[in-house]
């Protein structure tokens, strides 16, 4: 039986930050099941504020997956991680799973 990779589409969209400056994200990306994907978000506000990352599946409310420097809410798998440098924040999914197929949004939040 031949192995067929499952392709996941991780979509990113732009939203405004809490400080009313624009953030821009990657276009849609695809990743094979089990591989690592990184989604980036850029904006001047990210020099002063951390990014929050949200996952949204069709017909469902957004779910916070990363906030602050690199914090995960309870129940979020450790394959999700966040990082930042300068005006760029990144969400990394290490070993993507089928259930990770979703839209991912970034937003900036206060660094305190």
UniProtKB/Swiss-Prot annotation:
Region (Framework-2) location: 51-67
Gene3D superfamilies, A to Z: Immunoglobulins (2.60.40.10)
Region (Complementarity-determining-1) residue spans: 42-50
A GO BP annotation: adaptive immune response
Entries under Pfam families matching the protein: V-set (PF07686)
UniProt keyword Acetylation present: no
Main location: secreted
Assembly description: Immunoglobulins are composed of two identical heavy chains and two identical light chains; disulfide-linked.
Domain of life the protein comes from: Eukaryota
Annotated compartments: Secreted; Cell membrane
Keywords: Adaptive immunity, Cell membrane, Disulfide bond, Immunity, Immunoglobulin, Immunoglobulin domain, Membrane, Secreted, Signal
Statement: the UniProt record of this protein carries the keyword Cell division: no
Region (Disordered): 75-95
Residue span of region Framework-3: 71-106
Complementarity-determining-2: annotated span: 68-70
Composition skew (Polar residues), residue ranges: 81-95
Cellular component aspect of the GO annotation: extracellular exosome; extracellular region; immunoglobulin complex; plasma membrane
Domain called Ig-like: residue spans: 21-112
InterPro entries cross-referenced by the UniProt entry: Ig-like_dom (IPR007110), Ig-like_dom_sf (IPR036179), Ig-like_fold (IPR013783), Ig_sub (IPR003599), Ig_V-set (IPR013106), IgV_Light_Chain (IPR050150)
Organism: Homo sapiens (Human)
Disulfide cross-links: 41-106
Protein name in the entry: Immunoglobulin lambda variable 3-19
Function text: V region of the variable domain of immunoglobulin light chains that participates in the antigen recognition. Immunoglobulins, also known as antibodies, are membrane-bound or secreted glycoproteins produced by B lymphocytes. In the recognition phase of humoral immunity, the membrane-bound immunoglobulins serve as receptors which, upon binding of a specific antigen, trigger the clonal expansion and differentiation of B lymphocytes into immunoglobulins-secreting plasma cells.
């Amino acid at each position: 039986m031949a192995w067929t990779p499952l392709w996941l589409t991780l979509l990113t969209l732009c939203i405004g930050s809490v400080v009313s400056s624009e953030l821009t994200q990657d276009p849609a990306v695809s990743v094979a099941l089990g591989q690592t994907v990184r989604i980036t978000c850029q904006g001047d506000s990210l020099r002063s504020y951390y990014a929050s990352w949200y996952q949204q599946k069709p017909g469902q409310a957004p779910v916070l997956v990363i906030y602050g420097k690199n914090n995960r809410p309870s129940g979020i798998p450790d394959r999700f991680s966040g990082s930042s440098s300068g005006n760029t924040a990144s969400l990394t999914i290490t070993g993507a799973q089928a259930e990770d197929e979703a839209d991912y949004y970034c937003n900036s939040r206060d660094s305190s």
